[in-house]
Amino acid sequence: MVLEYQQREGKGSSSKSMPPDSSSTTIHTCSEAQTGEDKGLLDPHLSVLELLSKTGHSPSPMGQNLVTSIDISGNHNVNDSISGSWQAIQPLDLGASFIPERCSSQTTNGSILSSSDTSEEEQELLQAPAADIINIIKQGQEGANVVSPSHPFKQLQKIISLPLPGKEKTPFNEQDDDGDEDEAFEEDSVTITKSLTSSTNSFVMPKLSLTQKNPVFRLLILGRTGSSFYQSIPKEYQSLFELPKYHDSATFPQYTGIVIIFQELREMVSLLNRIVQYSQGKPVIPICQPGQVIQVKNVLKSFLRNKLVKLLFPPVVVTNKRDLKKMFQRLQDLSLEYGEDVNEEDNDDEAIHTKSRSYCRNKKAENSKKKSPKSNKKPKRKKQKFFTSWFTWGISITIGISFGCCVTYFVTAAYEHQTVKSLSLRPSILASLLSLDSSSDTINTPATASPSSTEQFLWFDKGTLQINFHSDGFIMKSLTIIKETWGKMNTFVLHALSKPLKFLENLNKSSEFSIDESNRILALGYILL
């Protein structure tokens, strides 16, 4: 390979002295012998390096090392077109300017990205927590195109289209071998693949990734009847839902939430287990069949108690159109709020902090203003309660005292009118309950009453007074007193209500009351007032 490179260099320096057919024959023989081994991703890039070294500039040691390590492709037409395109880039210092800056460590450790490398990075981002994904989105919005230092030799891949100059003669294409070379030069442009390391400061290609798109509110529908449910969703809400394109659980983190539709509880449990394993804490909306709401809630309690899943909306029955409409409206509102939150995150961190602080301050001020009138009203309410409580207690006490006085008055008046009209000495209430039955339960008291009074009310035997506490005497007398008191109260109230203006006259005219008891009536009136 070194000999071949030196031969080509000699031909480029003394092209006029050598015959034109010699260069083409040597290159064809080398390329045809190695066509089976030179098919690879590095062939176009190595051919570019070789052709850049043939433009009259001094070849770099890096280009010599790369040429000696890997063979050059044998397709002359493509090589010529690529050489022309890269010669057009040379005035802009995009091709050869960064080659001397590279060191040997970068060339040995540098690699070209393939589709497998990008897919691995995408999987790592998809399986990362939500906070990491948000940080990646923020970094992409800030315009940071520098790869992290943990991967200093990652390369960026970009397909670009460059215009080709007119037909020129170069040290490598002095004489056309076939008619295909003319067709290659007649093309206006050619598509090439350029790979650069992240360590270069010029012409850095951006890396495109699906994970750096703005997050969208999307719900994944899982279940055997998911397609039929998706068709039944109104068109205005279908944009919020999506059916799984691939039966891959690793795509769960891409969605905002997951809707599970099931017909049996076994299917629900299996879907929940998959979600717990792969969804990374995405909220869930269960949609069950009629009559399964209680069982579904019992199953969800165990998952919620262990903090395995989160509910975005309570369980909904498929046939309940009203609950489904509420769910759709709620999800639409959440999608609008989610979009507003994402737009707010696009602003600078300082602006967000100031807004949040000002918002908190305003909210605290509003809360303090709301609390201040409440604090002023609280003692007033306490005073009102205090006043009303004393008022009610006073009224209740006066009513109770007056009622008690009335009862005692009527009781004493009724009993005295029955028993003490003929007595010169008024006995007490206890004396009225005494009976003269000769029984064993007796209490001996000295006799002090006159014989006239003993003939009418009390009987004495041998200087002793016998008191009987049997039921036939004490209970019956108490019942008669209560009965008479109730009757007198009824008559008194009826007369008072019927003739309020002649209240005192009716009391004086009644046969049961005497004129001498007017002092008691006046005392009762003062108490009632």
UniProtKB/Swiss-Prot annotation:
Residues 370-381 have a biased composition (Basic residues). This is Autophagy-related protein 32. It comes from the Eukaryota. Residues 1-41, 345-381 are annotated as: Disordered. The modification Phosphoserine is found at residues 114, 119. Residues 12-24 have a biased composition (Low complexity). It is found in: Mitochondrion outer membrane; Vacuole membrane; Preautophagosomal structure membrane. Mitophagy-specific receptor that recruits the autophagic machinery to mitochondria and regulates selective degradation of mitochondria. Mitophagy contributes to regulate mitochondrial quantity and quality by eliminating the mitochondria to a basal level to fulfill cellular energy requirements and preventing excess ROS production. Recruits ATG11 to the surface of mitochondria. Also promotes autophagy-dependent peroxisome degradation. GO terms for biological process: autophagy of mitochondrion; mitochondria-nucleus signaling pathway. Keywords: Autophagy, Membrane, Mitochondrion, Mitochondrion outer membrane, Phosphoprotein, Transmembrane, Transmembrane helix, Vacuole. The chain crosses the membrane at residues 390-414. The lineage of its organism: Eukaryota, Fungi, Dikarya, Ascomycota, Saccharomycotina. The gene is ATG32. Phosphorylation of Ser-114 and Ser-119 are critically important for mitophagy and for the ATG11-ATG32 interaction. Phosphorylation depends on both HOG1 and PBS2. Residues 1-11 have a biased composition (Basic and acidic residues). The keyword rRNA-binding does not apply. Residues 25-34 have a biased composition (Polar residues). It is a single-pass membrane protein.
